[in-house]
């Protein structure tokens, strides 16, 4: 967030004033920001045609990398990432990084998890923009989900881990908080997952349908606090939005989930992202000499903020 104290002598339109202060802004970006309640004049949402005067206060809830886009460094996108990735494990073959909630793994923006990883590798002297191979994501996480992501540093690692993840050899365990206590407290959920491409969501159905894929999720209740439950969840299959949709299908959606969750509770608790963390990765046995040292290793992300709050009964 940026706070501006208006100092202009003559009354000036709000949009013109902001474009003078931040040349990277344009009418399209300003209108989008206003629709999303990201511009407040003296604490209130006001039309962009409103005249601002000396002494007025403007609050902008717009990312700094958008406001400062005119200061962008020439070159590849990773040079403009907001900082290096948080590294959990680094070896000659792979990088395991901890993704914060709200950061996309990749995409058109400069500041993505992959670009932060490339920036880290460049700072370590392991990657340059003209290298033949560019390190690559081996799997993905939803933007609102935090936790561990594997990045291949070599073509051989990329091929091996893409195959191992596709064949479900890499075990993935998550931590999450649900709105509602699941019954029974420990269970394995089955069914089929069906995508609704028009709405950008998935749903769980009991019977096989055209286009539906089998889905299996195992959960274990760690603790409960009021209306909430802290769970450890293992993905047996690995489908789009699997945990989010599966828990919602039994009446216990992930807290903070805007697609499948209880938005009244999300607003009450002021949660912006789903309380879901890719907490643990366990490697399979590798026969390849260059990867044998990784066999059976387990890696953990730091426990998310809500973990201890549920244990202590502060979040309920």
Task: List each model region and its residues.
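RNA pseudouridine synthases
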Residues: 1-197, 302-311
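Long C-terminal interaction/binding lobes of large macromolecular proteins
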Residues: 219
């Amino acid at each position: 967030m940026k706070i501006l104290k208006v100092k202009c002598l003559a009354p000036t339109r709000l949009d013109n004033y902001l474009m003078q202060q931040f040349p990277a802004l344009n009418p399209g970006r300003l209108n989008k920001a206003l629709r999303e309640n990201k511009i407040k004049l003296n604490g209130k949402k006001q039309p962009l045609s409103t005249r601002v005067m000396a002494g007025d206060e403007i609050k902008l809830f717009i990312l700094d990398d958008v406001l400062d886009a005119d200061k962008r460094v020439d070159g590849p996108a990773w040079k403009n990432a907001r900082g290096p990735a948080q590294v959990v494990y680094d070896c000659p073959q792979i990088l395991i990084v901890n993704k914060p909630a709200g950061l996309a793994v990749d995409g058109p923006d400069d500041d993505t998890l992959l670009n932060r990883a490339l920036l880290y590798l460049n700072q370590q002297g392991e990657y340059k923009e003209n290298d033949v191979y560019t390190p690559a994501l081996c799997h993905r996480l939803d933007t609102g989900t935090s936790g561990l992501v594997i990045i291949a540093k070599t073509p051989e690692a990329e091929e091996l881990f893409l195959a191992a993840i596709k064949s479900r050899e890499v075990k993935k365990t998550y931590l999450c908080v649900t709105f509602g206590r699941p019954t029974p407290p420990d269970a394995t959920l089955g069914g089929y997952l069906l995508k609704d491409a028009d709405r950008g969501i998935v749903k769980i159905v009991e019977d096989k349908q055209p286009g539906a894929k089998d889905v299996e999720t195992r959960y274990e209740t760690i603790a409960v606090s009021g209306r909430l439950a802290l769970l450890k969840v293992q993905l047996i299959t690995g489908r789009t939005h699997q945990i989010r949709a599966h828990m919602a299908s039994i009446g216990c959606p992930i807290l903070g989930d805007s697609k499948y969750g209880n938005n009244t509770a999300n607003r009450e608790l002021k949660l912006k992202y789903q309380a879901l963390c890719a907490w643990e990765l366990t490697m399979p046995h590798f026969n390849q000499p260059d990867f044998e040292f990784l066999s059976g290793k387990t890696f953990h992300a730091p426990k998310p903020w809500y973990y201890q709050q549920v244990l202590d009964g502060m979040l309920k």
